[in-house]
Amino acid sequence: MQLCRFYFPDEEPALSLPKEPRLGQVVGGSVVDLTASGQPAFATLSALLQASVTTPIEALLREVNLAALPAYAWRDLEREPAPGTPHLLPPVDRQEVWAAGVTYAWSREARVREARSKDVYVRVYDAERPELFFKSTAEKVVGPHDWIGLRGDSHWNVPEPELALVLNPAMHIVGTTIANDVSSRDIEGENPLYLPQAKIYRHACALGPVITLAEGLDPQHLAIRLTVRRAAAGQPEAVAFQGETSTAKMHRSLDELAGYLGRYNDFPDGAVLLTGTGIVPGDDFTLQDGDQVLIEIEGIGTLCNPVRQM
């Protein structure tokens, strides 16, 4: 089962469609408007995550008569929104977004290459306690087809494709989505204390397109693919970078990461936790203005974002 957040933009007033964010369930080629059911649990994502502490989301969905609710035509997730179709929002409303680092061996090696303080990354990879850091407020997260940004004070910016866990207030994994943990590698490499500046800024976190519920999906064995498309002046678009990994290569379990995030902390609206990247482009690669970044995760879908120089 897959859920999404969506809205209908203001440029289509003649359609008399609701303008506030909605929760939807993806069913075949349609998005069914769960918010239209009037049930409090489907009013917002926060309400749903809170309700899931006592009742599984799958059980809440079984109580809804989907046939009686408005349904809107879905679309190819790699295409721009078409008039009259739901425009996808990032799957967060009031959740804090956190991230884990150095959870794959390849990520550890890349951090060692870029860093002046190399032993920091070696030690955290093997340590009992994982690296966890704050990534974004919900307001700064971008969704499918929205742009991701390149810092003007950095010359080495990369996408980091990651599986993201959707957690309820009890820190239970209720679903997964796709994340792009955009990073300025030169800033982080200069000094580990610069990590917040390398990771936390406007348009540096993309999530979506949907939340795949945990039931029936093994998130510890999912293929992840990254493609960066680039069009040179006067030339057709071509692949500038492509890579693939699997969550099976992750050094830590997902429950372990979620458990550490919840230690001595409270998340009344739930949280989203990025689980680290196992795909790191070579040291000679950096994102450029106009690139298109596509991240595909098995069982979830494809997150597509254009790149813009800030």
Where are these regions (language model features)?
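Active-site microenvironments in enzyme catalytic cores
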Residues: 1-13, 54-230
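Gly/serine-rich nucleotide phosphate-binding loop at the start of the catalytic core
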Residues: 1-54
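Catalytic-pocket segment enriched in acidic/His residues
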Residues: 7, 185-310
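Short, solvent-exposed cationic patches
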Residues: 16, 53-60, 262-267
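Short, solvent-exposed aromatic-acidic interface loops
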Residues: 36-41, 178-183, 246
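Active-site-proximal helix-loop elements at catalytic-domain edges
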Residues: 40-72, 235, 240
